[in-house]
């Protein structure tokens, strides 16, 4: 049910907005990048630390013009080295690469750095879309780190 809700909300977001530059901070098998390319005219820069993710995503994305996306074999915590402009959409879909070693998961420390970079790089009015899966080894710690980051960020930067 969580996956369905994520996908439903994400697709509606893509269909209802005119994004021009997206970042897929956690490429995985390329599903989010595929959706961004399919439902928007955006260019996408996507990151993953596993070569297997890049290879499977290249296969999935072959129907799209290669000029519309860059797949980068590097951590999302280094995204500021690669961004050419301020993105108006940044997507995180944390956990592990389906069909691969479940011990290779999103690291809480690099995730925090990537979120900090995302907040600074995001175009005004842009969207950070974040999905966090739980249940795999290390997911609780990842969730705790993310919760702390978000609470501190909201407290420092947002007024209600």
What are these regions (language model features)?
Residues 43-48:
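Conserved SAM-binding motif I beta-strand of class I
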Residues 57-58:
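Conserved SAM-binding loop
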Residues 1-19, 31:
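S-adenosyl-L-methionine
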Residues 65-76:
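Conserved SAM-binding strand-loop segment of SAM-dependent methyltransferases
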Residues 125-132:
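Conserved beta-strand signature within the Rossmann-like core of class I S-adenosyl-L-methionine
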Residues 81-90:
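A short acidic, Gly/Pro-enriched loop at the edge of an enzyme's catalytic core
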Residues 92-113:
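Mobile active-site "lid"/loop adjacent to the S-adenosyl-L-methionine
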Residues 29-41:
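Conserved SAM-binding loop of SAM-dependent methyltransferases across substrates and taxa
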């Amino acid at each position: 049910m969580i996956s369905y809700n994520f996908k439903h909300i994400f697709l509606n977001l893509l269909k209802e907005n005119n994004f021009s530059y997206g970042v897929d901070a956690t490429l995985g098998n390329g599903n989010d990048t595929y959706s961004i390319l399919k439902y928007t005219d955006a260019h996408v820069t996507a990151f993953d630390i596993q070569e297997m993710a890049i290879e499977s995503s290249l296969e999935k994305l072959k129907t799209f013009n290669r000029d519309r996306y860059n797949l980068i074999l590097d951590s999302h915590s280094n995204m500021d080295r690669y961004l050419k402009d301020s993105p108006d959409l940044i997507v995180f879909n944390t956990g592990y690469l389906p069909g691969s070693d479940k011990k290779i998961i999103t690291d809480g420390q690099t995730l925090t750095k990537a979120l900090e970079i995302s907040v600074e790089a995001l175009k005004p009015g842009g969207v950070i879309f974040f999905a966090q899966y739980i249940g795999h080894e290390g997911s609780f710690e990842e969730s705790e780190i993310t919760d702390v980051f978000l609470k501190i960020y909201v407290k420092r930067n947002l007024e209600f």
